[in-house]
Amino acid sequence: SEMCIRDSIERLNIEKPETIARATEHIPEMIEYVQKLIDNGYAYETSRGIYFDISKLDKYPVLSNRNIDDQIAGARVEVDKEKRNPYDFAIWIKAPENHIMKWESPWGLSYPGWHIECSAMSLKYLGEQFDIHTGGVDHIPTHHENEIAQSKGRTGKIPAKTWMHVEFLQVDNGKMGKSLGNAYTFCLLYTSP
């Protein structure tokens, strides 16, 4: 929780951040970012949402050196048959009625794709290019590749000069993960007996 993060920062004597950016407070910036990608010819609309058109890039992927033809379309999400390319990714999604989080947008009630949040907020707070972007190794092949693609479509630049990725923490003879139910936070560790 945010309270745990703030408390951990204080207990570890880490300098407090100048800004704490919440994605839900930046919906207008995300909508504007998506519209700019459409205007620049890097995105298009289907009946299910707005997709980034990877065919517009001179190189994709950039960071992972993977062969895109080895990817399995639809491995994580259902394939939208209206997509121009199976590897085009959603940047804005038209919300089904039962979707909890949704906002008014030029495309109806909808919500941001996973990658657009980071691109819009980093552009707002850090500018078109910044020094270091960090994340887990699991973000390289999809999330960070797509952030780069969006930034290239919006500004013509790769957003970060340096990309640094951390490996997974190991716990109980395996990867630690929130979804695996074995994640330990600093708050949990210093409150345990």
Describe the residue ranges of each PLM region.
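Active-site loops and adjacent core secondary-structure elements that bind or stabilize anionic groups
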Residues: 3-4
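Divalent metal-dependent hydrolysis catalytic cores, especially in the metallo-beta-lactamase
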Residues: 10-23
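Alpha-helical recognition segments enriched in aromatics with Gly/Pro capping
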Residues: 7, 28-193
